[in-house]
Amino acid sequence: MEIGTSLKINMIIALFLTIVSEGIFSLVIINFLKFPVIFSIIFLLILWLIQWLISPYLVERNSVEVTRDDPSYGWVYELVENVARRAGIKTPRVFLVDEPYPNAFAYGNYVTGKRIGITIPLLQILTTEELESVIGHELGHIKHNDVEIGLAIGLIPSILGFISNILLTVGWATLIFAVDEFDILVGLTMLAIGGVLFVITFFLQLFVLWFNRLRESFADYFSYELFRERAWNLAKALAKIEIYMQNIRLDPFRGIIVTIPPTKVKESDPDLLIEDLLREKTNIFSDILSTHPHPAKRIKMIYKLTKPMIF
């Protein structure tokens, strides 16, 4: 089966299972608490809308917008503009982000405008062609409305996880400072409920992360569709990012910010790292807790797509 078609089918399956699992657990909890279903749905929609509206402002802290007239970075805007034209979408607003690691991410909404954030280190380590392929990947997220979908399917696990953390924290505190049997009973009850919610959150998060990894692979495929054999530059970009980040640890649950999980590397040469990743064996557990596919899986997919053209 063609890679693009396979990715689409897998995304549909993953999204369906994610929605069904979240719906089942939500209905069980709502019925247990005797909350009206309509009220609960309205409450979730309001929370999603608030998050959708304010998230761009939270993400773009320590960033500055770049325009075509910028004397130092106008070329970055023009590069995004050219790739957007090739992708057939409106040019997003471009922001340079003051972060210590190389990264690029898509964010924004229809109110603030779709946006792309690019960190300074990424500009420093990539060639123009490599940066172009990364931008193609991010524009794929914008064209496919991945930001909105990601916020929607991640909302329920986030709420349950937040409540779970509160119950576990307060439960332990209640046990520690308990003065009678009633306090102990309350503390144990909180720990029990918090523990159950933690397990549910973890289970749901596995589905969300699975869908996120498929979205990332589809964004890689979108970059390939834009540049064909030149999409091999995306593999080189990924290798350079991995090398740069070999000593940086990032939380895979950072939410809206699209990050690239670091892996330990020995080589300083991207080509050597690519060769190692092409030989590396991976399985379903290699990236099960990551928002992005394992680097070896991404490199292998790009290699499979571009091999007939350049190798």
UniProtKB/Swiss-Prot annotation:
Keywords: Cell membrane, Hydrolase, Membrane, Metal-binding, Metalloprotease, Protease, Transmembrane, Transmembrane helix, Zinc
GO MF entries: metalloendopeptidase activity; zinc ion binding
Main location: membrane
InterPro entries assigned: HtpX_protease, Pept_M48_protease_HtpX, Peptidase_M48
Any single GO BP term: proteolysis
Residues the record lists as binding Zn(2+): H137, H141, E216
Ranges that cross the membrane: 12-32, 35-55, 159-179, 184-204
Compartment list: Cell membrane
Membrane topology: Multi-pass membrane protein
Transport is among the record's keywords: no
Cofactor note: Binds 1 zinc ion per subunit.
Catalytic activity, EC: 3.4.24.-
Cofactor field: Zn(2+)
GO CC, alphabetical: plasma membrane
Keyword Hydrolase: yes
Active site annotation, chain numbering: E138
Similarity section: Belongs to the peptidase M48B family.
HAMAP family the record matches: Pept_M48_protease_HtpX
Protein name: Protease HtpX homolog 1
Lineage: Archaea, Thermoproteota, Thermoprotei, Sulfolobales, Sulfolobaceae
